[in-house]
Amino acid sequence: MKFLPLFLGVFLVLSASARDELPPVTTVSSVDLQEYIGTWYEIAAIPQFFERKCVGNTTAEYALTPKNQVSVVNSCETKSGKLSIAEGRAKIVDPTTNAKLKVTFVYFLGWRYLFGGDYWILALGDRYSYAVVGSPNRKYAWILSRTPELAPSLLSEATQALTLQSFDTCNLIFTPQKGGHQERTPLCKTPIGL
């Protein structure tokens, strides 16, 4: 009889933690890499250590390589006004959808994906006007656009895609862009259209 309270306590703790588990992150059903390559402007992102010098005008340039990888060139403006550039590679992890990639910026006698990060394409706008990218652990997320400013209706769609995947949109911060949003404010605190 002494074990009944202990059993009930363990059961309640396990039940509560099971309810708190988030559903797995899912990707789009397919990505046409020919449509995806090109220049993307960072509209909002979860701040990362590798972007700590960046103050705005952050872009990513993607191109296909002869080895069926994606060349990645990220650039941003620093506080001093200089351009910071990082080159990397992405390999396709799920060739049936092209929606899961592994990105690395480590090159030593070849690109080292062991140190790479998950780059999952979670949502795409019509004609690839925007992309929502994240990681399965929800520690990384970006809203990317083909233009420095994303129309309010498209920003709303992209934000909703993150919310439906249980990302905390307060963790995403707007990236200042010339011709776009100018303040580093949380995505969740900024009314759509400002």
Spans of model-derived segments:
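A beta-rich soluble binding module of mature secreted/lumenal proteins
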Residues: 3-194
